Design a protein with these regions (language model features):
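Intrinsically disordered, low-complexity regions enriched for glutamine and histidine
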Residues: 16-18, 38, 776
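Residue-level detector of functionally pivotal "anchor" positions at catalytic/ligand-binding pockets or at interdomain
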Residues: 768-784
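Beta-propeller blade termini and top-face loops
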Residues: 21-772
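Bacterial Sec-dependent N-terminal signal peptides
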Residues: 1-22
Length: 785
């Protein structure tokens, strides 16, 4: 363990001055500077060389946004992978092994990458996922390597936050085009299409349609690199609504330049009007460049949803739009015609193409040797061999939700696909596939829970997969833990879990938007039981967060708490329920949409008194009850901002102490919000101290040392050994999203759930053994009452 206290003190002194002002962090430049501070902290941290051990799962990969390759020419393909939240990965042996090559750059979310046609060692990477997901994140501009990924240089555009496409001039590598949809949650001017002619030293914005409109796709004519087509989309994402195209949106469409972006012409003939054009993918037929395709998420209403009809998540179904529609031009974009959905059979097929979330997809490719062979990416890979008139699925054996594809221009049978399960390869035009799962450890965990079995087990939910568990085997030594295959358990892709400590078998799991179920680990799924009533009579509709908080009482595990817009309590293990709070959110009717919002996002109970509960909401409210729910008091106070409450921890060492973290991700705010109260929430102090960068997702106390706190953020893990006065980077994790963490109280192992790199464990002995002591300073009940 490193001892660098003097250097730490200097750095802390510098950063503490910066942290006194709690303004939101809204610019990419600020975020980059904050990450530089994080790396400086890592270098001087007393705990920076502790090793996080990868726990798996080796049988699950994660979402990728793009894939490109360099043809073999007598050797193996070199494959480059852009992941949604795991950085960039490279294989020099056609997928036998992959290595991360973009680990400490201030972000791990990648929107697109491009390999230079003139020099395969030159690769451009655009950070910030352009697909809008519940876990998509903002990036910090574009980067370039000239040595095959050994070193990287930041090349600007950090204010774009997202990148959807990068194109490099085939003959002049200094000419590069970068498309950005812009900020996901807020309006900004740094979006559209950018061009550099000097390798990234200077940029010019060459296509811009307003602070809500960005460029989602572009393609270059293989005959003339000055001819480009670009698609724009005016998108609005709200915390309570999926992104969509509205009737007042006038900036959606397809644009063409013939002079390298100096001037643009909108292409409209035969295409839907602007207010119906959602996300649009475009591609050119290399074999006949006059043929151009547009894959449009068409927002024209196809039919009205019936009353009581539900979507795939059990929410009220919205009116059904026309959705995935393919258009074709045979005259280089001058005129277009719809080619898909012209028969009832084709219309039915295309209606299920993208599920209910077409804005997530919007990618298509044309076979480089056949202008009539077209691939569109949705839930599955869909192929047409007749120019879009009919489609059929291929690759149904690989993971769903397709986001990227690369076809070898010299061998169109060789296809690489990027999807929510990683990367897959086909050598026969999609008839057969092989997936790189253990080779790409990219699992996107949302949560972690443990039990007290021997060996202990950990549980977690994984984006677009399910919920899983595994054993943590310490028998070979605390520093020799091996990654494992994980097994299915109760839950869904976004869940919280609670394990009954009396049997280490009964498991409770929240599921989509507030649903709750119970089972046993050994008998699942056969004994799964749904627990919650549909609605309480006086409530119009129950609202539950994507991961609604569920809590088993530490005083009596038969008592179960569950957070919707109000707190529910069961005293018989979930058999019956009563509501013990009013609606704790602002309950603004203008913010009720098709995404559950204005819900409880955090919940905790004091181990000292079962009547003391804390609850926080996604719209920034914070509450306390001292009498088991009979009366609730709002304890949000200045200087707290109105931000999503990401975690509440009632101290297990001191009765009156409670910790709260807030995340500004959905406000494009990377500020660090960490608060402590020592008087039950009557007053709050900022203990973010020298933590340089957020957002903050979780805080935990060490169960055996009352002075130690752990913090999980969007760049890694921090530890404080003095109750939050000073923080240090903990361990050798790469830059990664830490969505949850826990400390096993018996085995003293720290567990982190990362959203992009799987799950890790760390031996906590070097951190807390010298600090462990008897609990002290417990507030008496008299002070509480």
């Amino acid at each position: 363990m490193k001892r660098k206290s003097a250097a730490i003190a200097v750095l802390i002194s510098t950063l503490s001055v910066q942290s006194q002002v709690k303004a939101p962090v809204l610019t990419g430049a600020e975020k980059l500077n904050m990450y530089v501070s994080h790396e400086q902290m890592r270098e001087v941290s007393a705990y920076g060389d502790l090793h996080w051990q990868y726990l798996g799962p080796v049988n699950i990969s994660g979402r990728c946004t793009d894939v490109e390759a360099v043809g073999p020419k007598g050797k193996s393909y070199t494959i480059w992978v852009a992941s949604a939240s795991s950085g960039v990965w490279k294989s020099v042996n056609e997928g036998v092994t992959f290595e991360p090559v973009f680990e400490h750059k201030g972000t791990s979310t990648i929107g697109d990458l491009a390999v230079c046609p003139a020099d395969p060692d030159v690769v451009w990477v655009g950070t910030g996922e352009a697909n809008i997901f519940r876990s998509s994140n903002a990036g910090c501009g574009v980067w370039k390597t000239t040595d095959g990924g050994k070193t990287w240089t930041h090349m600007g555009l950090e204010e774009t936050f997202t990148v959807s496409r990068i194109l490099i001039h085939p003959e002049d590598p200094d000419i590069v085009y970068v498309a950005s949809p812009g900020h996901e949650w807020t309006r900004n001017k740094e979006r559209g299409l950018f061009k550099t002619t000097d390798g990234g030293n200077h940029w010019e914005k060459i296509l811009y349609k307003g602070p809500e409109s960005g460029v989602n796709d572009m393609v270059m004519d293989p005959r003339d690199p000055d001819v480009l087509y670009a698609s724009t989309w005016q998108r609005t994402r709200l915390k309570w609504n999926d992104p969509r195209t509205y009737e007042h949106h006038k900036n959606n469409g397809i644009w063409k330049t013939v002079d390298g972006g100096k001037s643009w012409k909108q292409l409209t003939r035969g295409l839907p009007p602007s207010q119906y054009m959602g996300r649009t993918g475009i591609d050119i037929a290399r074999s006949d460049p006059a043929v151009v395709y547009a894959f449009v998420d068409d927002y024209e209403i196809a039919y009205k949803a019936e009353e009581g009809e539900l979507d795939s998540y059990g929410r009220p179904k919205q009116d059904v739009i026309k959705g995935a529609t393919l258009y074709r031009s045979d005259d280089a974009g001058e005129s277009w015609r719809q080619v898909s959905g012209l028969t009832e059979e084709s219309k039915k097929y295309m209606s299920g193409h993208s599920g209910t979330y077409g804005w997530v997809f919007g990618q298509m490719r044309v076979d480089p040797s056949d202008a009539d062979r077209v691939y569109t990416l949705g839930l599955y890979i869909n192929v047409s061999t007749d120019g879009g008139a009919t489609f059929g699925p291929i690759g149904k054996s690989i993971h769903v939700d397709q986001h990227g594809m690369w076809i070898d221009p010299d061998n169109s049978g060789y296809i690489l696909a990027a999807h929510d399960g990683g990367i897959s390869v086909s050598y026969d035009r999609g008839a057969n596939w092989r997936s790189f799962i253990p080779e790409l450890p990219l699992a996107q965990f949302y949560n972690v829970e443990y039990d007290m079995s021997e060996p202990f087990r950990v549980f977690g939910s994984v984006q677009d997969h399910h919920s899983f568990y595994t054993e943590v085997d310490l028998s070979r030594g605390r520093d020799k833990i091996r990654p494992t295959e994980w097994e299915y358990t109760l839950g869904a892709e976004g869940s919280t879990h609670q394990i009954d400590p009396r049997d280490n078998s009964t498991i409770f799991a929240s599921l989509f938007y507030g649903k709750l179920a119970r089972a046993t680990v050994e008998e699942y799924p056969d004994d799964r039981e749904w627990l919650l009533p549909e609605n309480f009579p006086e409530e119009p509709e129950a609202r539950g967060q994507w991961m609604a908080p569920t809590l088993l009482s530490s005083h009596n595990p038969d008592i179960v708490y569950h957070g919707l817009q109000y707190v529910l309590k069961s005293t018989d293990g979930g058999g019956t329920w009563k509501k013990i709070s009013p609606d704790l959110t602002f309950n603004d009717p203008e913010k009720i949409g098709d995404i559950s919002y204005q819900t409880i996002s955090a919940l905790d109970e004091s181990i000292f008194n079962s009547d003391l509960l804390y609850a926080g909401t996604d719209d920034g409210r914070l509450w306390r009850t001292k009498n088991g729910g009979e009366r609730w008091e709002e304890i949000w106070k200045d200087p707290m901002p109105v931000r999503w409450i990401s975690r509440i921890v009632a101290s297990q060492h001191d009765f009156g102490t409670v910790y709260v973290t807030q995340t500004g991700r959905r406000d494009d705010d990377a500020q660090v919000y960490v608060w402590r109260s020592q008087d039950f929430g009557n007053s709050w102090e900022d203990i973010a101290s020298n933590v340089p960068t957020g957002p903050v997702n979780v805080i935990r106390e060490d169960p055996g040392a009352d002075s130690i706190l752990y913090l999980g953020t969007d760049v890694g893990v921090y530890v404080s050994t003095d109750r939050g006065q000073e923080w240090q980077v903990l361990g050798d994790l790469p830059c990664t999203y830490v969505h949850d963490l826990a400390i096993h109280p018996r085995d003293n192992m720290l567990i982190v759930a990362t959203h992009g790199r799987g799950m890790f464990v760390l031996d906590a002995d070097p951190v807390n053994c010298e600090n462990k002591k008897e609990d002290s300073g417990q507030t008496k009940n008299g002070d509480f009452l």
